[in-house]
């Protein structure tokens, strides 16, 4: 991709994600590393990283989830595995952007919500935050080192480069 250089921190992660079939580019020559990820994209990346397992159920719990959508099976799988519950009782909001806090929480749940020891070690993370355990686990396991200056930026939009990097580090 012309927008991914060998010197970019996410170069190996993008290469890995392509080789594993987790994602493709956004065009023939572009990956769009700085583009934001949607809830549908993030859940799909997680599902593909897990080997694209077939969901066991066929009941669609969301009014905004089309059976024809590329992410349909990924969302069903994510709900079945407790990775997400949607944004309300009957909506998934597939096109909503996902934050770094949400993404790490999804990843933590996909990994079976392993326990962590200690704190999240970031100035902008409190033990009262819903994503505290996920961020602490990710930091302690080398999955994230934050965004710099002791911060994680949990409310910042998660980019394509960031999601594939988190997945890559979790897999290695």
What positions do the PLM features span?
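Feature responds to low-complexity, polar/acidic, surface-exposed segments characteristic
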Residues: 1-9, 24-73, 80-101, 109-134, ...
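Ligand-recognition elements built from short beta-strands and adjacent flexible loops
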Residues: 13-14, 74
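Alpha-helical segment that forms one wall of the substrate-binding/catalytic cleft
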Residues: 105
